[in-house]
Curated annotation (Swiss-Prot):
Its EC number is 2.4.1.-. This is Probable xyloglucan galactosyltransferase GT17. GO terms for biological process: protein glycosylation. Functions in xyloglucan synthesis by adding side chains to the xylosylated glucan backbone. Involved in the galactosylation of hemicellulose xyloglucan. It comes from Arabidopsis thaliana. PANTHER family: EXOSTOSIN HEPARAN SULFATE GLYCOSYLTRANSFERASE -RELATED (PTHR11062), XYLOGLUCAN GALACTOSYLTRANSFERASE GT17-RELATED (PTHR11062:SF255). Glycans are attached at residues 70, 169, 230, 390, 426. The chain crosses the membrane at residues 35-55. GO terms for molecular function: glycosyltransferase activity. The keyword Cytoplasm does not apply. GO terms for cellular component: Golgi membrane. Belongs to the glycosyltransferase 47 family. The keyword Membrane applies.
Length: 455
């Protein structure tokens, strides 16, 4: 196989007579000045509101679809303090960044193109908002709780957790989660199975909700509460050893199609794009972490290889925050290296698969123990695993994989794209199961198999 660095580009007022002009000139100037002042004030107010409260929570109903799944889901209408009320403080929902642009458009973020678009600059920790918007418009939603198979509790727990991450008063850090659990466990429908048919969807990792009594790393105790342990908790990263009620859902990427045709067009494009690079790495080094060593090694090997494209992310580098730049690197590559980041999992994995790039993992907890609802049982069919302890020469190992194997693996990766993608909440003519459909189907099956109802 030959590889090179060739780039692939994926009305005016009518005038009055002189007498009228003279008579009203002074008044007219006063009116003009007043109007201009009002216009300026309105513009300033509009700009302020746009920058500070740009979110839209408009669960606009799409064209009605038939429920093609064998389940119904009930959505609790929670007090606003548990979800959309949090967005009023969007500038302070994250200690590192202003989240106002990111909570716009029901969590999809800012559009990457003008007009109606399916591409957005979506924040990696915003899945809970997108999930909420999708379920609100889901064809299998029921407004009759007595007919529901599963019950969705739309708590924006991730956004709340990140807003109080540095709160030293642990009681205050936990208080909203505690109020939520007290509220939901007091509902009639909780009592029919003690919450075992209820679920949360959280956009952050499970570690942010598992503070024990003797440790404090910024987390709250939501997932440690006994009543929550009865529920199913969907999260972008589960605790892989003891999180029996944790279920991994994909990190949101940038593509949220309105129609099935858009998805199929994208898949065809990824099947046919030229991939001049054997492999690539998008990421930066880590300090003070066990995972730092493998990251440093990946950066080193990629930088030294003529077959690897490196997009190094340091000090919040803007290129790494440009979705099209990131996807461009991945679409030019056959394999994409996926080292653990601050935790085991990475949004980059889902960006890579969206770009049709075969992921290479160095820890089983980056993918294999996380997203079982979404992936084939045969891990080797869509990915490569290299144990980080084996000091593997990455380029040599990847070159051992035959061209036919690469083609087959890439086809499976591209076939997986729809189920790893969050369709647009207002999608129309979209009949491919997306990330939300997959999760709801699995939750309903689990409830039917395991829940004993008593009222």
């Amino acid at each position: 196989m030959t590889f090179n660095k060739r780039q692939v580009k994926i009305n005016h007022w009518p005038e009055k007579n002189d007498k009228e002009k003279q008579k009203y000139s002074k008044n007219r100037e006063t009116v003009k000045l007043t109007l201009l002042t009002l216009l300026l004030l309105c513009s300033i107010c509009f700009l302020f509101l746009t920058l500070n409260f740009p979110f839209t929570i408009e669960f606009t109903a799409s064209i009605p679809r038939t429920c093609d799944h064998n389940f119904t889901v009930y959505v609790y209408d929670l007090p606003k303090e548990f979800n959309i009320g949090l967005l009023q403080n969007c500038r302070h929902l994250n200690i590192y960044t202003n989240m106002c642009p990111h909570v716009a458009n029901n969590g999809l973020g800012q559009p990457l193109h003008r007009g109606r678009t399916s591409w957005f600059s979506t924040h990696q920790f915003i899945a809970e908002m997108i999930f909420h918007a999708r379920v609100e418009n889901h064809p299998c939603r029921t407004y009759e709780p007595d007919t529901a198979d599963i019950f969705y509790v739309p708590f924006y727990g991730g956004l709340y957790a990140s807003s109080v991450f540095r709160e030293q008063n642990l009681t205050k850090r936990d208080e909203l989660a505690v109020r939520l659990v007290n509220y939901i466990s007091g509902q009639r429908w909780w009592k029919r199975s003690n919450g075992r048919d209820h679920f949360l969807a959280i956009g952050r990792t499970a570690w942010d909700f598992m503070r024990s009594s003797d440790t404090d790393f910024g987390a709250n105790m939501l997932m440690q509460m006994p009543r929550v342990m009865n529920m199913s908790v969907l999260t972008v990263e589960r605790q892989p050893w003891n999180g029996d009620n944790h279920f991994g859902i994909p990190y949101p990427s940038y593509f949220h199609p309105y129609t099935s045709a858009e998805m199929v067009t994208w898949q065809d494009k990824m099947k046919n794009v030229e991939r001049p690079n054997l492999f690539s790495f998008v990421g930066g080094p880590r300090k003070g972490l066990e995972k730092a060593a493998i990251r440093d090694e990946l950066i080193k090997q990629c930088a030294e290889s003529s077959h690897c494209e490196l997009l190094k992310c340091e000090n919040g580098g803007s290129r790494c925050h440009n979705p099209m730049t990131v996807l461009g690197v991945m679409a030019r590559s056959r394999f994409c290296l996926q080292a653990p980041g601050d935790s085991f999992t990475r949004r980059s994995t889902f960006d890579a698969m969206l770009a049709g790039c075969i992921p290479v993992f160095f820890s089983p907890h980056t993918m294999y123990t996380q997203y079982m609802w979404y992936l084939p049982d045969d891990k080797r069919s869509y990915s490569v695993f290299m144990d980080e302890k084996n000091n593997t020469h990455i380029e040599q190992e990847l070159l051992r994989i035959s061209e036919n194997e690469v083609v087959q693996m890439r086809e499976i990766v591209i076939d997986l794209i729809p189920r790893l993608t969050y369709a647009h909440p207002n999608s129309t003519n979209y009949d491919l199961p997306d990330a939300v459909d997959i999760a709801l189907e699995a939750l309903a099956k689990q409830a039917r198999d395991n829940v004993v109802v008593s009222l």
